[in-house]
């Protein structure tokens, strides 16, 4: 019998979260059952999926949270490293984000605005200010400005970027980016 390895378990669960998120994106929540999730994950039986998750609802919420954390990391990797990078970042990043993550963001929005998953959405989003503030401290250091001078502007930028990713509203984006 194989010995339980927490690192292998975590790695495999993360792979499942990625694949399950993709299954939901490809097929929608209603059209994605456990058999289809197993197929995406390469499992032969539902039991293998239950090794990692207690229910389909848990798969939905954990895969969305996992995707959002990955998105946040990507968002943070693209941050300006100097003042010279700032204009390019402000102008180009929202469009890159919409192109690469627009569908993901619409799906996340769909899940977290559903009455069924509203609490999980609140729980997840309640941690965002702390994560973003940590990120903004990093950007402030890179740009040699105070945290206080850019915090509100960066929150506005993040909101504008997400709004654009969801709805492709160029006017809203341009007005807010120009204000920043």
Where in this protein do the model-derived segments appear?
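Hydrophobic/aromatic residues within well-ordered alpha-helical segments
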Residues: 12, 56, 63, 67, ...
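Amphipathic alpha-helical segments used for helix-helix packing
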Residues: 98-122, 166
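Amphipathic alpha-helical packing segments from all-alpha helical-bundle domains
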Residues: 72, 76, 117-147, 151
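N-terminal intrinsically disordered/low-complexity leader segments
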Residues: 1-10
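An amphipathic alpha-helix adjacent to DNA-recognition modules
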Residues: 10-18, 30, 51-76, 80
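Helix-turn-helix
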Residues: 23-58, 62
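Hydrophobic/aromatic-rich alpha-helical bundle segments in the mid-to-C-terminal region
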Residues: 125-126, 139-180
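Hydrophobic alpha-helical connector segments
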Residues: 62, 75-101, 146-147, 154
């Amino acid at each position: 019998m194989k010995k339980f390895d927490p690192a292998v378990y975590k790695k495999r669960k993360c792979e499942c979260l990625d694949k399950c998120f993709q299954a939901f994106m490809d097929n929608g929540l209603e059209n994605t059952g456990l058999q289809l999730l197993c197929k995406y994950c390469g499992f032969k039986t539902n039991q293998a999926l239950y090794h990692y998750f207690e229910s389909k609802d848990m798969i939905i919420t954990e895969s969305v949270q996992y995707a959002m954390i990955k998105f946040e990391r990507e968002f943070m990797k693209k941050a300006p490293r100097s003042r010279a990078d700032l204009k390019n970042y402000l102008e180009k990043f929202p469009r890159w984000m919409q192109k690469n993550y627009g569908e993901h963001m619409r799906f996340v929005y769909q899940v977290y605005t559903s009455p069924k998953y509203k609490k999980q959405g609140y729980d997840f989003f309640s941690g965002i200010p702390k994560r973003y503030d940590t990120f903004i401290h990093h950007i402030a250091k890179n740009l040699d400005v105070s945290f206080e001078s850019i915090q509100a502007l960066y929150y506005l930028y993040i909101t504008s970027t997400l709004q654009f990713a969801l709805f492709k509203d160029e006017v809203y984006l341009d007005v807010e980016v120009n204000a920043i």
